[in-house]
């Protein structure tokens, strides 16, 4: 053994080839400070052994290296610039040391080689991957750029255009795509990875492969003619800004760094990368996006823990077909859990199967699936007009019409047809789980399972714990949602649960502005372009359906009359009474037609303005800051109330629910990250300015206490 540490081992193989193996004690290899120090020491040991003629890097895990240890980031990024600069320089000394070894080097890649893992393989002369490999630099998704030489080496290996596409998108690449652009040198079956890697290294040792020229290219300026460079970077800036927008600076910074470093050697190019990295690491966007990543890990960790308590789900059933039922059936079947789709009407079953087939066909067209896989998934969906195929299923998702009596009747009926230990859930967005549980003989095996529409796109599932729901029931539903590829958050029962409970105060703030004469299109523009929502409130209500919104609003008003009760007609009532339900009947706040791609196209409709003006009088203009304050303050305070009341367990889960369930702007991180960023005291002062607008604008006593103590919702790094 040449070197050994808890994360790395180096041994000598035949023909004087050293083998450096990453073998962390946890489930995956990642670059924390300890591993970087170990790699440095390992490389020193390798350099000192003059018998070594080549080096192979590999992993003892299912993945090569998944990246840097992001749990260290927030604390590190809070340090002074000089500390961050020193950390980057010390880490890059290690990667340079790997690149500068006096013999050929090769990475044998299995599974994920992402972020710092990708930067490791770029520092070697050759790269060979097996078919399980996924390679990429996802740092822009965290609001930063690669910091261990990724922006320097990748353009010199695969060309500037390809590197710009890889790094700005943050997507990981399949081995065939990586091979096509020259990021790797060969793709082999997993069992052939080691022998193929050793053969390639031996060819390099025998000078059949020119490793010195390859290495020299990585150390030199980019070989890109000046005019071509100008055109390439100008085009990239336009395309990337169109996708990333003004709220996400990291992708644009990547272009700037690669452009500036194009005429530089390695040392100077790395300094350019370091300076840009430090600048981005200090931004609120990076704090928010890293926070989302860490919150996502926390939520997934909870789901994994729930899996240990969960009842095994081998088969499922959804009651109620149609678009929603078809979406749930598709999601379950495509992730490997066979499902019965039961309805009382054949046309509804046809619609549900059609929805699943449509989604699968789209996957095949995009090259993400094959006709054979599509057939397998469709065969995993069993349509039924009676309960016979449902009786042996492990979990049932009731997804019939959103009406308490209908749901209660269906739940009582299905309980008579399933086994004693089958789990029963309701996909409801507003109806009390405790109320529905009264229709069951065994309420302990029942809870809510709220999917968001469209099911195949929306990552969140709210798992609603009723007062009688057992721990095993909740854990089993969480595990099933995870198996379906969803992110489950557990919430306690209350009107609207979590997501809808915090959404409708936002709509109330919007309605209040319209009652005071604001233009709904102007509000949408501010909330989309400035605050960063994917859709403004008027557009979102049109997409959700104003009939659905009107019903949910009534449920919320009944549940929280002191804050959400209405004294008169609002804009949602006006649209509902005029039978303007949104996209579903092509008229809501906006009017809709179908574009050339078959997608809904929205336009302004004079009738909407006439209806609103007749009810609320002449329009008047509002400043952007007031629009943001009057819509967001109610949502933020209601989110805090949910935490204080124990409806949601933690700020992390609340923020994930908002980002994944409502599209809360990721660069703001969620309500609690946003509060910490602007300061709780500043928010309280802002809310007090609008307190005269009613109960939705009244901050809680706990918020005032936190503000007085200069506190925060997340533990400060």
Curated annotation (Swiss-Prot):
One of its GO terms (biological process) is fatty acid beta-oxidation. GO terms for cellular component: fatty acid beta-oxidation multienzyme complex. The keyword Isomerase applies. The record marks 119, 139 as: Important for catalytic activity. It holds the Pfam family 3HCDH. NAD(+) binds at residues 324, 343, 400-402, 407, 429, 453. Pathway: Lipid metabolism; fatty acid beta-oxidation. Its EC number is 4.2.1.17, 5.1.2.3, 5.3.3.8, 1.1.1.35. SUPFAM superfamilies: 6-phosphogluconate dehydrogenase C-terminal domain-like, ClpP/crotonase, NAD(P)-binding Rossmann-fold domains. Residues 1-189 are annotated as: Enoyl-CoA hydratase/isomerase. GO terms for molecular function: 3-hydroxybutyryl-CoA epimerase activity; delta(3)-delta(2)-enoyl-CoA isomerase activity; enoyl-CoA hydratase activity; long-chain-3-hydroxyacyl-CoA dehydrogenase activity; NAD+ binding. Gene3D superfamilies: 1.10.1040.50, 2-enoyl-CoA Hydratase, Chain A, domain 1, NAD(P)-binding Rossmann-like Domain. Keywords: Fatty acid metabolism, Isomerase, Lipid degradation, Lipid metabolism, Lyase, Multifunctional enzyme, NAD, Oxidoreductase. The active site is at residue 450. It comes from the Bacteria. The keyword Isomerase applies. It catalyses: a (3S)-3-hydroxyacyl-CoA + NAD(+) = a 3-oxoacyl-CoA + NADH + H(+); a (3S)-3-hydroxyacyl-CoA = a (2E)-enoyl-CoA + H2O; a 4-saturated-(3S)-3-hydroxyacyl-CoA = a (3E)-enoyl-CoA + H2O; (3S)-3-hydroxybutanoyl-CoA = (3R)-3-hydroxybutanoyl-CoA. Residues 311-717 are annotated as: 3-hydroxyacyl-CoA dehydrogenase. Heterotetramer of two alpha chains (FadB) and two beta chains (FadA). Involved in the aerobic and anaerobic degradation of long-chain fatty acids via beta-oxidation cycle. Catalyzes the formation of 3-oxoacyl-CoA from enoyl-CoA via L-3-hydroxyacyl-CoA. It can also use D-3-hydroxyacyl-CoA and cis-3-enoyl-CoA as substrate. In the N-terminal section; belongs to the enoyl-CoA hydratase/isomerase family. In the C-terminal section; belongs to the 3-hydroxyacyl-CoA dehydrogenase family. This is Fatty acid oxidation complex subunit alpha. It comes from Shewanella halifaxensis (strain HAW-EB4).
